Amino acid sequence: MTSERDGTSATFGLTRRVLARLSAGALAVTPTLIAERRDFHRYAESGWTEFRTASLIARRLVDLGFDVKVGRDVLDPDARMGVPDVDVLEAAWGRAKAQGGDPEFLKEARGGFTGVVATLSHGAGPTVGLRFDIDALDLQESHAPEHRPEAEGFASVNDGAAHACGHDAHAAIGLGVARVLADLSSTVKGTVKLIFQPAEEGVRGAKAMVAARVVDDVD
């Protein structure tokens, strides 16, 4: 619904110009979004072991100008549920390091602290939170030649971990949203929090982020 007088959409009070920029921005980031989704798919990591995934997300958000918090700053250690044994965590952390995880943020995530929260603020206004899951399932991905990820070279290389529930896309979409918001930061008033949640499978990760008061200020 749009006012012909001022060109303002009733949806979120956005002007036609801003909506057009949102649409153009979404189209512009699509190739990068696809590439990142396939990268996350190829290096699938299950709950509390998303070390590579979380570290690369954090690095890209910092590069986009977001205020980024990770690790124990966004996860209450005592509220985490279903955390793997220490030897499993350490093996996954070492694998993430070998597979190109960001060194700075890998340190913060070590031990199963794989949450990321990015904030972008510009002036007074509401605080909106958007959540994105990042974990894979404990499954073995098919390597049959007709399986599209296998045929196109992005099937999971990590045995026993596969993105069969779309969280590779969730994570990539979150970064796509971040890129569009960064471009529009001077236009939109208020605060946006992008919450990249680990261990969604088994409903294990949200409690620890809530306990860390990540969403206390979200309207």
Predicted regions and their residues:
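N-terminal acidic, proline/glycine-rich, low-complexity intrinsically disordered segments
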Residues: 1-6
